[in-house]
Amino acid sequence: MGKLAVAAITSLWVIPMSIIVNHIVPEPYMDEIFHVPQAQQYCNGNFRSWDPMITTPPGLYYLSLAHVASLFPGMLLMENTSQSFSEACSTSVLRSTNAVSAVLCGVLVYEIIRFLGPNLSDRKATFMALVMSLYPLHWFFTFLYYTDVASLTAVLAMYLTCLKRRYVLSALFGTLAVFIRQTNVVWMLFVACSGILDFTLDSSKQKGKQEVNQELHQSSNKKGATLRSNLRKRKSDISSDTSDPFNHGQTVPSTEDTSDLVYDIYTVISTSWNLKWRILIKFSPFIFVVVAFGIFILWNGGIVLGAKEAHVVSLHFAQIMYFSLVSALFTAPLHFSVNQLRHQFHQLHRNWSLSLILTLVALVAGFVSVHFFSLAHPYLLADNRHYPFYLWRKIINAHWLMKYILVPVYVYSWFSILTLLAKTRRQTWILVYFLATCGVLVPTPLIEFRYYTIPFYLFMLHSCVRSSSFATWLLIGTIFVSINVFTMAMFLFRPFKWSHEDGVQRFIW
């Protein structure tokens, strides 16, 4: 019932907003001026045609072909004309590819929430999925022909099927995700690693449980009451942990105990070595895709397809700082509540010496990142249609001290994200998540909030299964809706013109 409710309610805002956007902005805008004509070339059967300004693979265009093909018979009946297939690939129809993807994405979010939090009520899981469907960056680009919505949908489908241990299907969704946006290969590696963590830690616990059972059996003939009691206690501890290798919905040791991380890494490495052939077989579909992608990079001479001079891989470590703050601000009730501030202080107080060292290291890393690895891409400085343009000019670059003043806020935001994840995730999983986020964001020279969507969703999916009252989620949803109303109103009803270029310009993320 929850899936149907999510799909139906999501459609209630997707359909009317799509109609409004297509009515007011019928022509391709911004990046659509590249994507729409390219998709229309595919609709015409010109699969060898390629716009050299497009940086991403053609996965979205093939999805659109399938989407238009599914609509085409109905369009012929409704219009009662001999409209050709290529004529059916209008801007509005191509945009509807993302509208359908957004509905599917909401259902996937619901399914993942239910899997990670089986004790959650259907009502609360439905509400959480609906709130996450309103995430401003995801919601806004639902109504335009960009790759973001389809990319997120494919990644979530890959993750859900991996959680369910359907690895071949997961790798197929991963292939689609990479074919839509090539940086998704990093998220494919993340999903594969999370699957390996699941598999190896579960295997090691099952082995430990079998050893305890054997010891219990041997001790039964020795009348060792104390030994049997201790073994039963050990068995109980292992059994309670084996039911879920990631302790979904249960608090795991906090980040102050680094021995847990070291032990888990040792367990994963040793178990992986012992099970290396089984792991290679189970996860071989992921390996094939990653190897094929590596061959593509060698053949292509880089990761992007077109406009390579404007998308040079850079060391932009400040990008992960921006991600933490943007994510924390979007979900301020989670990060800046009295309870969360108290929890953060309690975590620091429990092991103040280690916490002090970690805080100092994080602050130093933050200062180094913003001082030496803070980039201002020419696109960022020249295009006042994007909100990051104003963020950079009015806040980050308003004064030379400002970027340093923000470092403690960045660090707090990351600590808050990690402590929320630590309530439901093992530290090895958190480490892999952090590395994947860095792998996607650090090489990217351009500040684009759209790039934060996938790591944001993964954080929210794993923090929501423990936290948060209904009121907290209602407040987050209110923030999302308020931002969406503002950004869409600015996009639709506050157009402006440039003196040096014809056409109407609009504010966009």
Curated annotation (Swiss-Prot):
Residue segments, region Disordered: 210-254
Reaction catalyzed: an alpha-D-Glc-(1->3)-alpha-D-Glc-(1->3)-alpha-D-Man-(1->2)-alpha-D-Man-(1->2)-alpha-D-Man-(1->3)-[alpha-D-Man-(1->2)-alpha-D-Man-(1->3)-[alpha-D-Man-(1->2)-alpha-D-Man-(1->6)]-alpha-D-Man-(1->6)]-beta-D-Man-(1->4)-beta-D-GlcNAc-(1->4)-alpha-D-GlcNAc-diphospho-di-trans,poly-cis-dolichol + a di-trans,poly-cis-dolichyl beta-D-glucosyl phosphate = a alpha-D-Glc-(1->2)-alpha-D-Glc-(1->3)-alpha-D-Glc-(1->3)-alpha-D-Man-(1->2)-alpha-D-Man-(1->2)-alpha-D-Man-(1->3)-[alpha-D-Man-(1->2)-alpha-D-Man-(1->3)-[alpha-D-Man-(1->2)-alpha-D-Man-(1->6)]-alpha-D-Man-(1->6)]-beta-D-Man-(1->4)-beta-D-GlcNAc-(1->4)-alpha-D-GlcNAc-diphospho-di-trans,poly-cis-dolichol + a di-trans,poly-cis-dolichyl phosphate + H(+)
Biological-process GO terms, alphabetical: dolichol-linked oligosaccharide biosynthetic process; leaf development; protein N-linked glycosylation; response to salt stress
Subcellular location: Endoplasmic reticulum membrane
Glycosyltransferase is among the record's keywords: yes
UniProtKB keywords: Endoplasmic reticulum, Glycoprotein, Glycosyltransferase, Membrane, Transferase, Transmembrane, Transmembrane helix
Topology with respect to the bilayer: Multi-pass membrane protein
Pfam families, per the entry: DIE2_ALG10
Known EC number: 2.4.1.256
Lumenal side: 26-57, 121-124, 192-285, 333-355, 422-428, 494-509
GO molecular function: dolichyl pyrophosphate Glc2Man9GlcNAc2 alpha-1,2-glucosyltransferase activity; glucosyltransferase activity
UniProt entry tagged with the keyword Amino-acid biosynthesis: no
CC annotations in GO: endoplasmic reticulum; endoplasmic reticulum membrane
Pathway as given in its UniProt record: Protein modification; protein glycosylation
Entry's transmembrane regions: 5-25, 58-78, 100-120, 125-145, 171-191, 286-306, 312-332, 356-376, 401-421, 429-449, 473-493
Positions with biased composition (Polar residues): 215-229, 239-254
Superkingdom of source: Eukaryota
Glycosylation sites: N351
Membrane-side (Cytoplasmic) residue stretches: 1-4, 79-99, 146-170, 307-311, 377-400, 450-472
Deletion phenotype: Small plants with reduced leaf size. Hypoglycosylation of glycoproteins leading to ER stress and activation of the unfolded protein response (UPR). Increased sensitivity to salt stress.
Family recorded in the similarity comment: Belongs to the ALG10 glucosyltransferase family.
Function: Dol-P-Glc:Glc(2)Man(9)GlcNAc(2)-PP-Dol alpha-1,2-glucosyltransferase that operates in the biosynthetic pathway of dolichol-linked oligosaccharides, the glycan precursors employed in protein asparagine (N)-glycosylation. The assembly of dolichol-linked oligosaccharides begins on the cytosolic side of the endoplasmic reticulum membrane and finishes in its lumen. The sequential addition of sugars to dolichol pyrophosphate produces dolichol-linked oligosaccharides containing fourteen sugars, including two GlcNAcs, nine mannoses and three glucoses.
Stated name of the protein: Dol-P-Glc:Glc(2)Man(9)GlcNAc(2)-PP-Dol alpha-1,2-glucosyltransferase
Organism annotation: Arabidopsis thaliana (Mouse-ear cress)
Gene name per UniProt: ALG10
